[in-house]
Amino acid sequence: MAATGAAATDLEVVRGKRAALFFATVVIVLGLPLWWKTTETYRAPLPYSQISGLNSLKLRLMVPVTVVFTQESVPLDDQEKLPFTVVHEREIPLKYKLKIKCRFQKAYRRALDHEEAALSLGNIQEAEAMLAEPSEQAEGSLTVYVISERCSLLPQDMMSYIGPKRMAVVRGITHREAFNIIGRRIIQVVQAMSLTEDVLAAALADHLPEDKWSSDKRRPLKSSLGYEITFSLLNPDPKSHDVHWDIEGAVRRYVQPFLSALSAAGNFSVDSQILYYAVLGVNPRFDSASSSYYLAAHSLPHVINPVESRLGSSAASLYPVLNFLLYVPELAHSPLYIQDKDGAPVATNAFHSPRWGGIMVYNVDPKAYNGSQLPVRVEVDMMRVMEVFLAQLRLLFGIAQPQLPPKCLFFGPKSEGIMTWELDRLLWARSVENLATATTTLTSLAQLLGKISNIVIKDDVASEVYRAVAAVQKAAEELSSGHLASAFAASQEAVTSSERAFFDPSLLHLLYFPDDQKFAIYIPLFLPMAVPILLSLFKIFLETRKSWKKPEKTD
């Protein structure tokens, strides 16, 4: 009986050892790999090497320029050399990781018969009408006509002319170095019409050191797919003023042509509103010398915040909102004028705030109060108001007056409020800005993934990253080829895809699941099972080790 009990005990011990080994094998062979696979952070492969290469991206902005020479514009020997091509390239000195070079590719040729006839006229406007911009002329390209030194098309004291279209006129010279002298004049003109250091600096203002550029360079709006424009009439004293403004007609006559010409840069929506009892929030000061009130320049920044609370929240808007306010001061503070930093009245009686909008103070004619009962009827001169708002709108989009070369004839924009080459220059700047933004976003995403290991990257997010990288590369290629329209479209796609990937909500799913929380969940689950298995394995190890050291019996 004792032998039978001992045998049963030994069998039970062996069975326990086998069970412990079996459980340990299952945990190690199946459990740990399965747990590791099911709890790992999924990351679709990303083009890290290509993203890293974007930091050293070199942009070459090519501007195609067609230079047309009329008869007697250059010596006969030089005319026989036509046609040929000259390339002028220079680097834009910006302290930024993107290296930008501007390349002017000038294709010289002789004038055709209809061009000779148009340029032989005595009026530049008539000549420009005959030299209507060909429909096949691409965005970003320019045409420069070189006329003879004695041609009466331009005033004799003028050496060049810049028109509203993609056209310019330069006076020639009969000199043995004619091509070199005229070439320098052409470069001055095309730089004024296309790309300058200031234009690109304003576009990259958010990416450059703050002490590098003044606040004026940060005035333009950031590039966006769309913009919302709101015109507001502020009447703080409706008991004294019955204000009427034809905002619909003004938008149709003055604003809509400008926005239609600017449609290539984004989509626009326009609305208007009238706000009663809306005050500026800053008490004007009284000037006894002129019996008027004024707002000093240092108080203008404090005007916006109190008014903005009445304008309606723009938080729900997907696009930047531009506010243009027409303020009719109350009777107790009339007339009201805005002063500049030197204390002089501002001619337009208006001011603007970068990336926000503008405010214009509209004073009621004092004669309206003579013999009239309150409230007096006020008819707003919308032409005068819209001239100010359009000028502010141009500044907010970074469309400033060009830096004209010496002795250059320039008439300014027509009824559209913007010249064709100004739109091209805006698209150049927006393309560079979009590429800089997309590159920064992709680089930040790659750095973030390197620092935080539990960020999930799904396949759709990875596809957006690949799409953004490809769009950046395509935009850079199109810019170097002088294809402005396709380059701008590709740059917009790059920004959209990169930001869609960076701000995808799925990246945050495991971001707030640190390691201490993992241990708090796994220990109660695995510890009760792991302790018996580990103790059994340890006991088996000790017994096995003891059996190895036990000496064998000898007869």
From Swiss-Prot:
Cytoplasmic-facing ranges: 2-18, 533-555
Gene Ontology annotations for the cellular component aspect, listed alphabetically: GPI-anchor transamidase complex
Keyword Endoplasmic reticulum belongs to the record: yes
Bilayer topology term: Multi-pass membrane protein
Residues the record lists as binding a cardiolipin: R15, R18
Leader sequence residues: none
Keyword Glycosyltransferase belongs to the record: no
Segments on the Lumenal face: 40-517
Pathway participation: Glycolipid biosynthesis; glycosylphosphatidylinositol-anchor biosynthesis
Gene Ontology terms describing biological process: attachment of GPI anchor to protein; GPI anchor biosynthetic process
Glycosylated residues, chain numbering: N267, N370
Transmembrane segments: 19-39, 518-532
Key words, A-Z: Endoplasmic reticulum, Glycoprotein, GPI-anchor biosynthesis, Membrane, Transmembrane, Transmembrane helix
Location in the cell: Endoplasmic reticulum membrane
Family classification: Belongs to the PIGS family.
Physiological role: Component of the glycosylphosphatidylinositol-anchor (GPI-anchor) transamidase (GPI-T) complex that catalyzes the formation of the linkage between a proprotein and a GPI-anchor and participates in GPI anchored protein biosynthesis.
SUBUNIT field: Heteropentamer. Part of the GPI-anchor transamidase complex, consisting of PIGK, PIGT, PIGS, PIGU and GAA1.
Protein name: GPI-anchor transamidase component PIGS
